[in-house]
């Protein structure tokens, strides 16, 4: 695992955590410059997904431990905020609940927080991986049907599908199938605890309403008092398609400007 740093060393720290099988630049490369005016930005590049390393993703807990160790060693165990894109939101929940480091603000970006039994998780992973892994490795689906469906959706939905696919980071032949498998499976069997309530930590959730109503209940299940920002958008559409608005909202939250924060 690597953590890339940007901005002034004495600025408040914001930690960025990528989504499932995503490259850190694909997720956050376009917004990091918008944050470095105010923050020292730390961007995680997970084991198995960084082109400069020969590693494989282990488990959610092992990766969380590495993130905690870095924050303890380099930030005195305290950061201003953490933003998790999709899967990254699971890390935000785990980091908050484990209490080995402290964050003033934890922000989940459209995270689904899906969970399953070990048996079901293994089944889902084994079904999904043959479809998704070629996209990670080659930058496109192996199945002509899936590729055509994706192109059709892109034509129907405009910039969103193109921007969303770009968040994966293009073809990455160095990513192993085992890393993808470990990340899918481990995320499903490692849910955050229920009713997380940490003194001094505010949890904010970017709730993409077009994902469906069930996610509101899920957020309220796992967090005792989440601040839910309703957005009439698709999964991580704010980050993918509206970077200036995303950065403005993240900065308002992390700077504690509650009266300026708009849902």
Regions found by a protein language model. Name each.
Residues 4-53:
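Conserved HGGG/HGGXW glycine-rich cap/lid loop of the alpha/beta-hydrolase fold
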Residues 42-81:
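Active-site loop/oxyanion-hole signature of alpha/beta-hydrolase fold enzymes
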Residues 82-84, 109:
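Short beta-strand immediately N-terminal to the catalytic nucleophile in serine-hydrolase-like folds
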Residues 84-92:
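Gly/Ala-rich beta-loop-alpha elbow adjacent to hydrolase catalytic centers
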Residues 97, 105-136:
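Flexible "cap/lid" loop of the alpha/beta hydrolase fold
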Residues 117, 139-196:
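Conserved alpha/beta-hydrolase catalytic His-Asp/Glu region
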Residues 178-221:
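Conserved serine/cysteine hydrolase catalytic core
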Residues 233-246:
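Catalytic histidine-centered segment of alpha/beta-hydrolase-like enzymes
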């Amino acid at each position: 695992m690597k953590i890339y740093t940007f901005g002034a060393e004495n600025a408040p720290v914001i930690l960025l955590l990528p989504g499932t099988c995503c490259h850190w630049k694909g997720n956050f490369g376009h917004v990091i410059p918008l944050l470095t005016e105010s923050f020292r930005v730390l961007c995680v590049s997970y084991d198995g997904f960084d082109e400069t390393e020969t590693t494989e993703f282990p488990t959610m807990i092992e990766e969380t431990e590495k993130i905690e160790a870095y924050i303890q060693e380099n930030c005195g165990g305290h950061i201003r905020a953490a933003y998790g894109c999709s899967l990254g939101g699971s890390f935000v929940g785990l980091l908050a609940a484990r209490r080995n480091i402290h964050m003033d603000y934890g922000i989940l970006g459209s995270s689904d927080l899906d969970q399953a039994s070990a048996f079901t998780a293994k089944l889902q992973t084994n079904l999904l991986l043959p479809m998704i892994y070629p996209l990670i490795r080659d930058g496109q689906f192996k199945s002509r049907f899936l590729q055509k469906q994706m192109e059709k959706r892109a034509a129907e939905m405009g910039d969103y599908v193109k921007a969303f696919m770009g968040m994966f980071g293009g073809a990455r032949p160095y990513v192993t199938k085992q890393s993808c498998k470990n990340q899918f499976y481990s995320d499903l069997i490692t849910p955050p605890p229920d009713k997380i309530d940490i003194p001094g930590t505010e949890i904010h959730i970017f709730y993409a309403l077009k994902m469906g109503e069930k996610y509101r209940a899920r957020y309220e299940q796992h967090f005792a008092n989440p601040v839910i920002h309703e957005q009439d958008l698709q999964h991580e559409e704010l980050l993918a398609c509206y970077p200036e608005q995303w950065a403005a909202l993240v900065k308002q939250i992390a700077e504690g400007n509650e009266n300026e924060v708009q849902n």
